[in-house]
Structures are given as structure tokens and as C-alpha cells.
A protein has these predicted regions:
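N-terminal secretory signal peptides that target proteins for export/translocation
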Residues: 1-15
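Long amphipathic all-alpha helical oligomerization modules
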Residues: 217-223
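Short conserved catalytic/interaction loops centered on acidic-Pro-aromatic/His motifs
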Residues: 203-212, 225
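Acidic, glycine/proline-rich low-complexity segments that act as flexible tails and inter-domain linkers
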Residues: 37-49, 61-78, 83-84, 93, ...
Length: 256
């Protein structure tokens, strides 16, 4: 059997083949780069669930119950559990007061009734675990506060010297009773806190303190900047401007 001789590939055709192969290689590289970049962006961006926490805390603090109802629906749709949503509303009473917190809880109950009527079954999530610690609540609260601050606390601010009761309530109740409840992480609790303080307005010293704590517990600078952009749709322009100004100062000082 006689073998047919192979015809040489024309140079122009060969160049076209090589050119096409090169393009395909670059496409693969570009897609890989885009994928990695997207992962990085995703890692440094607030999730829909985290944005919902901001919106829920902000609207509750301001008593905007109509908007709160919408963002509670949104949060539950974004896989915020019922217990997490409830805990956000419980946590913020320490900063916005019982009336705002209670109205928020009542609104959540309305939302759950509406969703149940529509056949939506929301995940209730985990309950707070039982605290098994023989230390006093004051000692436990002090330990948690030092963990948030990132250093041992020496001395007390003047207002706590003037009002030892306030010092005790902060340590025993806020940082022990509330922060110990593991339905939310410290990181999530600080997100609730800065959302409330920023939305109430004219609380720059406290906002400065809690933005620093937010960085201490793991929030990134870019995420906090995104937090301020989320506030644009939940509170007034003056509050957003003040929050952005304080955040800029905090980030600058931490890099000096």
C-alpha cells in the first residue's frame, strides 16, 4: 500500500493557527485573572446579609418602621436567620433604647406573620448557648471589653468615675449579658453598633471608638467604606457625611 505524501501547511495558514492558539491562551489567562480578582473583591466586600444587618439596625434606630419592614424581608431572603434578626434588634436597645428595640421586635413579628401566610418557612437558626463561667459578670464583661479593645484597660474614663453605676451596667450588662450571647459574633455586633450610632447622629466620639473596635474585630477598611455607602440609603446626608469624616480620621491615625 502506497502512503500519500503529506502536503506542507502553507505559511500563512500556520501563522493563523499560531495566532488563534495565542489568543486562546490569553483568553484562558484573562478568565483566570478575572476569577481571582472577583474572589478578592468578594472577600473584601460586604455580603448581602451584612448589608441587611446595617439597614435593619439603621432603620430601627431611627424609628422608620415602614422601611424596616422591607429590609427585614430582604434580610430573611438573604439567609439572615430569625434569631439573628431578633438579636440585632435586641442588641441595639443598648444604644438606641428600649422603645426603638421593642418597636423593631414588633415589626419583625409582623413580617414573620406575613411570610408564614405566604408559605415561607424561614430558618430560625441557633439559640444562644448557656454561659458556663463562674466569674462575676463584671469580670466577664471586662474581659470581653479588653478583647475588643485589644489591650488591658488601666483606669476609667471620667464619666465612669463620676457614675460607677454606669461602669457597672456597661461591664455587667452590655459586655457580659449581651455580648456573651453567641447568636451574633463580636464582629456582627460591632456592625450593628456603628450602624445605630451613625444613624442617630451627633455621636462622633462614640462612633470613633466603635469604628476602631470594628477594625479590631476584623472589619477591613474597604468594608467600612462600603458600610458608609450603605448608610446613604438609610439615613440623612449629614449623618453619612459625619460618618465618612470620622472613618477617614480613624483610618489615617491607624496608619501613622
Amino acid at each position: 500500500m502506497k502512503l500519500k505524501s503529506l502536503k506542507p501547511v502553507p505559511i500563512i495558514r500556520l501563522r493563523n493557527i499560531l495566532s488563534t492558539a495565542t489568543i486562546l491562551v490569553w483568553v484562558v489567562v484573562f478568565i483566570g485573572f478575572q476569577s481571582n480578582a472577583q474572589e478578592t473583591i468578594s472577600d473584601n466586600s460586604l455580603s448581602d446579609k451584612e448589608k441587611s444587618i446595617i439597614k435593619i439596625a439603621s432603620h430601627t434606630a431611627q424609628g422608620d418602621l415602614l422601611q424596616l419592614k422591607d429590609v427585614l424581608h430582604e434580610g430573611l431572603d438573604h439567609k439572615l436567620t430569625v434569631n439573628e434578626a431578633k438579636e440585632v434588634l435586641v442588641h441595639l436597645y443598648a444604644y438606641a433604647g428600649f422603645p426603638r428595640s421593642i418597636r423593631g421586635l414588633q415589626t419583625l413579628l409582623e413580617v414573620l406573620e406575613e411570610r408564614t401566610a405566604k408559605g415561607i418557612q424561614d430558618d430560625w437558626g441557633a439559640e444562644a448557648t448557656t454561659i458556663d463561667d463562674s466569674r462575676s459578670k463584671y469580670e466577664r464583661g471586662m474581659t470581653i471589653l479588653e478583647e475588643l479593645v485589644g489591650r488591658p484597660l488601666d483606669g476609667k474614663p471620667e464619666y465612669q468615675k463620676f457614675s460607677p453605676e454606669m461602669d457597672r451596667f456597661l461591664k455587667e450588662h452590655l459586655f457580659a449579658d449581651i455580648f456573651e450571647r453567641d447568636v451574633l459574633t463580636y464582629k456582627q455586633r460591632e456592625l450593628v453598633t456603628i450602624s445605630v450610632i451613625a444613624s442617630l447622629g451627633s455621636l462622633e466620639p462614640m462612633l470613633r471608638s466603635h469604628l476602631n473596635l470594628s477594625l479590631n474585630v476584623g472589619w477591613q477598611a474597604e468594608q467600612l467604606k462600603e458600610f458608609t455607602e450603605t448608610l446613604v440609603i438609610t439615613t440623612i446626608e449629614d449623618n453619612v457625611f459625619a460618618t465618612k469624616t470620622v472613618l477617614t480620621e480613624v483610618l489615617k491615625r491607624r496608619t501613622e
